[in-house]
């Protein structure tokens, strides 16, 4: 299966690009993110803490928010788009 990642801020820097296509054998958003981290090892500490997705990582699947507890089980289809970005803050 192949998905496209749109990456923002420090995720973009770690993957050296704003868009990355990843081919992987899994079927969930979590599997896709794991494949991304395997392809770009610099991303792993930005995404995971103690083997779990960091709380602050925002995940969108085809423009829809995927909550942290749904990432591991949310199905993904060939050609889907996953966006990863850190929280936005301002003042």
PLM regions and their residue ranges:
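Ubiquitin-like/PB1-type beta-grasp interaction modules and other compact soluble beta-rich domains
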Residues: 1-90
């Amino acid at each position: 299966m192949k998905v496209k990642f749109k990456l923002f801020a420090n995720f973009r820097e770690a993957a050296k690009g704003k868009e990355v296509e990843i081919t992987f054998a899994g079927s969930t958003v979590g599997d896709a993110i794991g494949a991304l981290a395997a392809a770009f090892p610099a991303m792993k500490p930005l995404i995971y803490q103690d083997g779990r997705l960091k709380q602050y990582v925002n995940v969108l699947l085809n423009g829809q928010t995927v909550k942290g507890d749904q990432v591991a089980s949310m199905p993904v289809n060939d050609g889907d788009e996953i966006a990863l970005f850190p929280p936005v803050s301002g003042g």
